[in-house]
Amino acid sequence: MLTLASKLKRDDGVKGSRTSSTTSDSTRRVSVRDRLLVKEVAELEANLPCTCKVNFPDPNKLHYFHLTVSPDESYYQGGRFQFEIEVPDAYNMVPPKVKCLTRIWHPNITETGEICLSLLREHSIDGTGWAPTRTLKDVVWGLNSLFTDLLNFDDPLNIEAAEHHLRDKDEYRNKVEDYIKRYAR
C-alpha cells in the first residue's frame, strides 16, 4: 500500500536523480502541510497517551484522522469519545479543525461537538492559542486532558453542563454516566 510517507521518500529519491530540466508535471510538489504531517504523525504515534488511539481512514491522507479518547479516571472513565481532526492546507499557521463525534455532557464540549480548548483558537488574547510551534501531539494531549486536568467548569462552552455541576455534582455525575451508556460505548 502506498502511504504519504513512502510517496515522499520515493519522490525525494526521484528528485535527487533528476536535473531541473527533466522534471515533469507528473511529479507534483508535496505541500508544506503534508511534509510536516509525515514528521508529526510519526512523533504522535511514538508519544500517544495510553488512553488515546488514532485511526487514519485513508493512510494517504494524513490531514484527516480520528482520535478515540478512553479516559481511565474522572467523571468520564469508561467512555470512548471519538474526535474528527482535519488539518487545513494553511497548517501550521492555523490550527487543525476538531469536532467531537460522540454526544457528551461536558462543560468544554457542546452536545453538537464544538470544543473549547485554548490551543485550538487561531487568535487568543492570553497567548495560549495556536502558534506555528504547536504540533498534532499538542492537540491530542490537549483533547485527552479535557477529561482530566483541563476539565474547566469556570470557563465553559456548555454553560448548562457547568451550571449543572455547580448545582448538584451527584446529579451531574449521573447524567455523564447516562450519556456514556447511551452514546460512548
UniProtKB/Swiss-Prot annotation:
The active site is at 116 (glycyl thioester intermediate). It is an enzyme of class 2 (transferase). Pfam families: UQ_con. The keyword Transmembrane does not apply. Its EC number is 2.3.2.34. Keywords: ATP-binding, Nucleotide-binding, Transferase, Ubl conjugation pathway. Residues 1-29 are annotated as: Interaction with uba3. CDD domains: UBCc_UBE2F_UBE2M. One of its GO terms (molecular function) is NEDD8 ligase activity. This is NEDD8-conjugating enzyme UBE2F. It comes from Xenopus tropicalis. The gene is ube2f.
